[in-house]
Amino acid sequence: MSDQFDAKAFLKTVTSQPGVYRMYDAGGTVIYVGKAKDLKKRLSSYFRSNLASRKTEALVAQIQQIDVTVTHTETEALLLEHNYIKLYQPRYNVLLRDDKSYPFIFLSGDTHPRLAMHRGAKHAKGEYFGPFPNGYAVRETLALLQKIFPIRQCENSVYRNRSRPCLQYQIGRCLGPCVEGLVSEEEYAQQVEYVRLFLSGKDDQVLTQLISRMETASQNLEFEEAARIRDQIQAVRRVTEKQFVSNTGDDLDVIGVAFDAGMACVHVLFIRQGKVLGSRSYFPKVPGSTELSEVVETFVGQFYLQGSQMRTLPGEILLDFNLSDKTLLADSLSELAGRKINVQTKPRGDRARYLKLARTNAATALTSKLSQQSTVHQRLTALASVLKLPEVKRMECFDISHTMGEQTVASCVVFDANGPLRAEYRRYNITGITPGDDYAAMHQVLRRRYGKAIDDSKIPDVILIDGGKGQLAQAKNVFAELDVSWDKNHPLLLGVAKGADRKAGLETLFFEPEGEGFSLPPDSPALHVIQHIRDESHDHAIGGHRKKRAKVKNTSSLETIEGIGPKRRQMLLKYMGGLQGLRNASVEEIAKVPGISQGLAEKIFWSLKH
């Protein structure tokens, strides 16, 4: 053993709690990482007079330093040990063995990979994660993985001979790849990749991918899928929060913030003695047009300085946002605690990772909250209540797009009880109006849309007119003039005007072209569905306008000249070196192009000049 390492003094300081230890050599390199149910007992075994293994003797002889990280449970220690092994690749974790072989978690290389415990030589094709201290730890980890990432754990002999899924599928512990049609190849491969990343200690990547998939599902109104992924995210978060332990014994609160659709989420991680004890998401009420800095500053003040809360203050608070009164807040908290409290906004190292975790959790919690509140059914029910309608089954929204009055396109998007009905979206090319006259454009599109027979099931309950009072007046005039067989009085015409700064959440709604409008709170589900359909209509109109503009741009001036087909056009451009050369050519020069007569050359010349 190294003369510089005092084992006796060290062991006096070691706890009997579970945890992970890292052994360093004289060069500061981690040479071994271990896990123990009782750290004191396990570490004492290394410094007995009669060591059973020469390899253990070789390890102990090189120890210069030992760092210990206490965990809540053995499982927590197991996960942390695995992360450290993957991080440091200690050479004695590869060479050193106890009397029995170490078990591994095995991810097979089959078409539908399976998870299993493995001991002995690694002959089978696949990936091995470990080693783990004992079989119980592997089985416990496999059970945990099965709950979060339900990939198969059955033997191949069972898997190949199944015609219907087993009980594991019925209780949600397996995706059932043994039966065709139960799970797509892509989804199963994705879950396998999550397992691979998770066992490699890349928990953040797993969370990032899951959050992205949840947001996509939510945006596509696939709420059951979004809820399933949300539950998976929460399960991963529960594990990652337990396993993340800091080297520095941090005693701090970490506050991450997310803001969207008029709603804010403040997520607080409570870290004591370097361990994440827990976390909680708060959803403060946010008035419209409130700056994010004000949300953070107000929340922090209320959270810590209200006497009734009686919160235990940490030594340090990490914030996701710069505060103008950071020094004042720190001084106030220090006075309250009777000791120095640091408020930090630009952390580095592990602290930055803590803040990233808090920020991710805030975004995840906010997305979940919005998903719960923003189902189409809930939004339409809220809208019906605001508009004093019995129900809203179908909505249509119109928008106009043009560039300086040119290539005007109107869009109509349709929502039903399940959200966007994209198969019924329509674009209308507007012609015969004064360029830039949006009122005339709205008048034309509404007459074309509603001045004909409509099936009763296609009559909208609400028609949204993007543009405010003027456009709403046009809509009212059109419906007053309609001579149709269907009930033209059934749809409620609603004007939507953007706020002064054209910011989401500041919209004004109008029932009539005259008089004052009204606004909804920025976190109102009714407002969210209005914003959603309006944004869809706007994007649809702009998309159509861009296509029309691109078509005009890509259409050669030669295409409008009678007698010039594709072959002659190609010959002219090739002979003249492009359209610009053709524009600069004389009639005589154009007439020299094969296939171009004198008369046609004159027509081309004057068409390009005028």
From Swiss-Prot:
Q: Where are the transmembrane segments?
A: none
Set out the biological process GO terms recorded for this chain's protein: nucleotide-excision repair; SOS response
Keywords on record: Cytoplasm, DNA damage, DNA excision, DNA repair, Excision nuclease, SOS response
- Write down a Pfam family by its short name: GIY-YIG
Q: Which GO terms describe its cellular component?
A: cytoplasm; excinuclease repair complex
A GO molecular function term, named singly, is: DNA binding
Subunit field text: Interacts with UvrB in an incision complex.
Tell me what this protein is called.
Answer: UvrABC system protein C
Recorded source organism is Escherichia coli O45:K1 (strain S88 / ExPEC)
